[in-house]
């Protein structure tokens, strides 16, 4: 991706409108996970060091175009100040006279957090008037919100019509890592696709079948493939309207010389709970009133072996219902295999896979954890992301 980044422009004394992703989970006004704030720190620190006037914009939650008290960015600005070790000001508006006055009072290296951009109905409609208001605050637009890059909103894309537009360091790294995986991967290249539904991963599987050497299938979506092979799957998740597509994907893999791995055994249960009784059965032996909830031990070994012998692995979606202890072993085993693999570059595609490696304490062993669930999925599907397309070319 040959897009300009903050390293390619002069920032000293410039007012920089930097779109970050501070959409953090909150409980009773407290931030429960600050990963996204920490992920933006290198960009913010770089802007500060370069003597820019740093104006940060983000959304939080889904206020649907109106001010919602508990979705104000005030606690986020306070925590950011602690992490940066400096005074961070907070505006109660995202544009207009109040924001303009606060920007006018800024010195080089100052940091100001604007109010939640989704308090304004024009944000999600990519309204040109709102984009102009944002642009009026600054000299340069920096997009560092990879997590929102698949959205064509006023603060992620529209503003780029009115200002020079470059990526932040986080956005730059995401584009570099994901771009290299798709255009020039080290081989063997393995994709692990899990999660509940085939329909959410159709574009991903189709696009990756042209790129990968190995495709590993797990999670709830695997049972549609199992049924497509003619096996009974009991009460397991299945999308009957996707069975023909599953057959087509398996055929395509064969034609393209892609090794297609599916579960050979599964963990089954009669009840969905933390204390559930489970059994392990072969993939062709699921009883009628039981459901598959995780990949079995033989499958884990096979998958771990493929991972160990890969140079690049992209993982999108868990292998089972990892939120519940009895059904978490498959997802944990894939994470462990990635953590232990030597010389394997691991890319975790945001969302549930990222949550899983966090939960199992393996995050620091992964090469790259994407900060965008939906954005990384769309990027890996080969789609153009509005928040990236709008940036200036090198």
Curated annotation (Swiss-Prot):
Name its species.
Bacillus anthracis
> Does the keyword section mention Transport?
no
Q: Name one Pfam family in it.
A: PGK
Q: At which residues is Phosphoserine found? A: 183
Q: Which domain of life is it from?
A: Bacteria
Q: How does it assemble?
A: Monomer.
Protein residues bound to substrate: 21-23, 36, 59-62, 118, 151
Q: Its pathway?
A: Carbohydrate degradation; glycolysis; pyruvate from D-glyceraldehyde 3-phosphate: step 2/5
The GO molecular function terms of this record are:
ADP binding; ATP binding; phosphoglycerate kinase activity
EC number(s) per entry: 2.7.2.3
Q: Which HAMAP family match?
A: Phosphoglyc_kinase
- Residue span of the signal peptide, if any? none
Q: Which residues bind ATP?
A: 201, 292, 323, 350-353
Q: Per the record's keyword annotation, is Transferase included, yes or no?
A: yes
Identify the gene encoding this protein.
pgk
What is the protein name stated in its UniProt record?
Phosphoglycerate kinase
């Amino acid at each position: 991706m040959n897009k300009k980044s903050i390293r390619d422009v002069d920032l000293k004394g410039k007012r920089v409108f930097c779109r970050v992703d501070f959409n953090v989970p909150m409980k009773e006004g407290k931030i429960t996970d600050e990963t996204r704030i920490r992920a933006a720190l290198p960009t913010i620190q770089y802007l500060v060091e370069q003597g820019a006037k740093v104006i940060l914009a983000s959304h939080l939650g889904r206020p649907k175009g109106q001010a919602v008290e508990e979705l104000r960015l005030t606690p986020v600005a306070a925590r950011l100040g602690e992490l940066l070790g400096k005074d961070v000001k907070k505006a109660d508006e995202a544009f207009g006279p109040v924001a303009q006055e606060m920007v006018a009072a800024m010195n080089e290296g100052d940091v100001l957090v604007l109010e939640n951009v989704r308090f304004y109905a024009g944000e999600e409609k990519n309204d040109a008037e709102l984009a102009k208001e944002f642009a009026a605050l600054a000299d340069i637009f920096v997009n560092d919100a990879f997590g929102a890059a698949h959205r064509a909103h006023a603060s992620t894309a529209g503003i780029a019509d009115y200002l020079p537009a470059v990526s932040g360091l986080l956005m730059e790294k995401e584009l570099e890592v994901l771009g290299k995986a798709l255009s020039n991967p080290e081989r063997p290249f393995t994709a692990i696709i899990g999660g509940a539904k085939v329909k959410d991963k159709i574009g991903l599987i189709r696009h990756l079948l042209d790129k990968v050497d190995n495709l590993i299938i797990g999670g709830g979506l695997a049972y549609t493939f199992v049924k497509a092979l003619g096996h009974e799957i009991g009460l397991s998740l299945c999308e009957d309207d996707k069975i023909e597509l599953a057959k087509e994907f398996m055929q395509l893999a064969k034609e393209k010389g892609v090794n297609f791995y599916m579960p050979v055994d599964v963990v089954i249960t009669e009840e969905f709970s933390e204390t559930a009784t489970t059994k392990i059965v072969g993939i062709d032996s699921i009883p009628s009133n039981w459901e598959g909830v995780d990949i079995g031990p033989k499958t884990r070994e096979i998958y771990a072996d493929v991972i160990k012998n890969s140079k690049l692995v992209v993982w999108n979606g868990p292998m089972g219902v990892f939120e519940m202890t009895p059904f978490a072993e498959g997802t944990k085993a894939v994470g462990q295999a990635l953590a232990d693999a030597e010389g394997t570059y691991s890319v975790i595609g945001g969302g549930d896979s990222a949550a899983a490696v966090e939960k199992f304490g393996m995050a620091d062993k992964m090469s790259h954890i994407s900060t965008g669930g939906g954005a990384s999925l769309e990027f890996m599907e080969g789609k153009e992301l509005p928040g990236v397309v709008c940036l200036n070319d090198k």
